[in-house]
Amino acid sequence: MSILEQVQPIETMLPERYYTMSTEDMEKRVREIKEKMGKMLFIPGHHYQKDEVVQFSDAAGDSLQLAQVAASNKDAKYIVFCGVHFMAETADMLTTDDQVVILPDMRAGCSMADMADIEQTERAWKELTKLFGDTMIPLTYVNSTAAIKAFCGRNGGATVTSSNAKQMVSWAFTQKERLVFLPDQHLGRNTAYDLGIPLDKMAVWDPHTDSLEYDGDIEEIQVILWKGHCSVHQNFTVKNIESIRKNHPDMNIIVHPECCYEVVAASDYAGSTKYIIDMIESAPSGSKWAIGTEMNLVNRIIQQHPDKEIVSLNPFMCPCLTMNRIDLPHLLWALETIERGEEINVISVDKQVTTEAVFALNRMLERV
């Protein structure tokens, strides 16, 4: 079942009048509705969201953190999630049946999450089992669909975040000889390498050709990486780093581990969104930084730290296009429909999928 089949009802067309409203009028209406609804309304906002949206967020953070905060907010009947599909799915799975999770724009997806669908994954597991038998455990990045989390849950696996990936990969190897990591090959590769697993003991599963790509001995493969990636972090290159080293030799380079192995290896630091934020905050005044992550977040960090010289690692970087679909007009539209007693763009994950996906989430939460 696709996510669009799981969501009822579906509204994707923003009414015309929101295109003609001034920013001031929209901001005023959002404030009015937030004040009117009080604790009945909770708006989580991901770090990659636009400032025009983040300013109204009741909590800002990464995807799992926001889902957990939403789940702990029992007073909120409506959770208007300013993020992308898989984040809203996770929030729905962790909240109660009485709470309603709404995504302001149904087009706000995640290309990386969509790179691993359940049919491809089931087929891959079947083929890999022919090669490796019962020696594998699946781990999925939380940046994945509910169906993929459920797959991991029913096959003894778990979810991971960029913050706890090392802990969870280490745990996985106490369970089985081999790890299947999806959907982001780069986070999987960088994490495994950081734990001492050589590149020639890693393979890549291509879901489009149903083939395993590897250089070494197939019997020695320890990590099978799904051929997926983040389209934003894929755009940071070693050439970007070489340019910074040449033109700004005293500048620190910090990147997200969704960047490719070569970029992470050439950087000074690599870590999760929270790690990047904390590193910049704790850095001394006057320090210089080139950051390799999503542009909305980089711009926000620049604004928050005028005492430091901060640039994007890639000067031509664009924000995450799907994350950027959540804007002020869509946020206001979602809030006004709630105010009228209507519900649009509701995220509702199948009960069986939820049960199995929560197994995977809990296996992670119990260990970190």
UniProtKB/Swiss-Prot annotation:
Keyword Cytoplasm among record annotations: yes
EC top class named in words: transferase
A biological process term (GO) from this entry: 'de novo' NAD biosynthetic process from L-aspartate
Known catalytic reactions: iminosuccinate + dihydroxyacetone phosphate = quinolinate + phosphate + 2 H2O + H(+)
Binding note for cofactor: Binds 1 [4Fe-4S] cluster per subunit.
Transmembrane segments: none
Subcellular location: Cytoplasm
Keyword terms, alphabetized: 4Fe-4S, Cytoplasm, Iron, Iron-sulfur, Metal-binding, Pyridine nucleotide biosynthesis, Transferase
Enzyme Commission number(s) of this protein: 2.5.1.72
The protein's name: Quinolinate synthase
Species per Swiss-Prot/TrEMBL record: Bacillus cereus (strain B4264)
Gene name of this polypeptide: nadA
